[in-house]
Each structure stands twice: as C-alpha cells, then as structure tokens.
Amino acid sequence: NFDGLLRVIRDDAGILLASLNPETVLNTLDECPVAVLKEHPLSILVLMRSMFNWRQIPKMMELKQLLLTAIEERPEIPPEERGNLLGECDLIMSFLCYNDISAMSRLHRSASEQMSHPAISIQNTGGWTFGSPSVLMMFYRGPGELAGELAEMDECMPHYYKITNGHGQGAEKIMHAEAAFMQGNFTDAEIALESAYAQIAGNGQENMALCCDFLACR
C-alpha cells in the first residue's frame, strides 16, 4: 500500500525514517509507481530531506525534479499550497549550500517569502548543529570574513526561524559569543552567551544548549 506508506512518511516527518536502512528506503522508492509518488508532494519533501541526511544527493535531486513536475501538472493546487511546497523545497535545497551563509540565506529568504506555515520536513526539536559543538566552527569560512559572516547570520536566521518554528534558535547569538571569545573580548562574549542561554531556555533544543555549555566551559 504505497499510498498508506507515503502518508506515514508525511506524518512522521522523517523521524522514524531516519532509523531505517537507507538502502531499504531506496529500494522501496524504486518500487513505488511514479504516479502514486506525485500524489504525495509533502512526502516527497520529507524524502528529499532524508536523502540529504543519507548523502544520497542524486536521489535528492531526482525527487526535487519529481516534485516540481507534480506541482506543474496540477494547476488546481491553490497558490498558498503551491508557495508552501516550493518554499519548503528551497529550504531543503539550502542545505546543499552548507556552509556558505550567503547562499543559504538567499534560499531561506526565498522560502520565507513563499511559505505561510512552518516546514513539515524539519522538526524544531531535531538537531541543528549536525553534532558540532560550535556554531563558529560550522560557519567561519576564511580570514577577514568573520564580520560579514556574523552579519549574514543576524540577517538570515530570523527567516529560518520563521519557517521552522524556531529550529536552531540562538545560533547567531552563540556565534557572536564564540567570535568575541576568540578575539579576547571576554565581557562581550559573556553577554552574548547569556543572551543565547535566555533565548533557548526551555525550548528543548539540547544541541544549542550544548554549544553554549562548551563555550561556558572554555
């Protein structure tokens, strides 16, 4: 029952899917009729995100094209729903630009402009840091670029929060705190760190709290 399977994938938003063997999922997808898959655009979005997590980028791109085709073939889709689908597609594609904040930000803004509700493929209780103990470590790219990268984080994260229910909240403040610490501005670092702690308090995003804790220990 591929219809039922795709509905479960949509409702689960990829949480249980992540515990499955990627090869099993890929084999099942190969067996699923394309016409059936096209009827479940939200499930395609969840699968795209899962393919990114599994580093199955060619399959991710194949699913993206299938999504765009499915949307194009269904002119009866309301404009708001169409915007949410295309916006979430942009959001998922932004992960391919990691760790170029400028490129990611362009796609986050595009998604934010199109979407009227939060993404279904990203849960705000899920990890944001991909296991990294440092936001600065994730996004600092080269000498002389730090000020621009901090400004980009300040600009892009509100757009990202809007479409993910605050996933990764506090990231820009943590990066500011880490940057100030590395520059020897310890008072500024402590102020930014406390601001980050206040922003993430009680939201269940332990990965962000751990980044704060690692900096506090230093």
Give each language-model segment a name.
Residues A35-F214:
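Internal alpha-solenoid helical repeat scaffolds
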Residues A216-R218:
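Long, low-complexity regulatory tails in eukaryotic proteins
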